[in-house]
């Protein structure tokens, strides 16, 4: 049996793999900035009602984030909160980052998202078609 999280009106397992890049793919996420970003994202997630399961910077210019959230949390809003708040905090703590970027933006506009869970699409289709 799959362990589901429980809310007042539903049971769920909602995990998301999020990926986004720095503006212009600038390689600014290194050293203490990289370490601090991973800490900051964990705090931001906790403060906004979702759980950061993992976060890792790749090639100093983009980050992979794995989060678990209640179904009522909108994915674009979750990404917006993570990107906006992390940029604000990193710019305050590491003003030298701004020298590599212009326009006041740390992150590019877009992001990628994938869902993740224990049950595969094939298993869901099989279950639906069987019953």
Task: Describe the role of every protein-language-model region.
Residues 1-131:
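Basic nucleic-acid-binding interfaces
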């Amino acid at each position: 049996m799959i362990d589901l999280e429980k809310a007042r009106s539903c049971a769920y397992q909602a995990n998301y793999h999020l990926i986004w890049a720095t503006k212009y793919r600038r390689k600014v996420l290194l050293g203490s900035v990289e370490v601090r970003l991973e800490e900051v994202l964990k705090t931001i997630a906790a403060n906004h009602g979702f759980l950061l399961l993992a976060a890792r910077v790749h090639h100093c210019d983009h980050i992979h984030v794995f989060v678990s959230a209640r179904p009522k949390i909108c994915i674009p809003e979750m990404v917006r909160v993570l990107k906006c708040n992390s940029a604000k905090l990193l710019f305050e703590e590491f003003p030298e980052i701004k020298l590599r970027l212009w326009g006041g933006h740390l992150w590019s506009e877009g992001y990628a998202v994938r869902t993740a869970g224990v049950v595969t699409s094939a298993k869901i289709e099989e279950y639906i078609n069987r019953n």
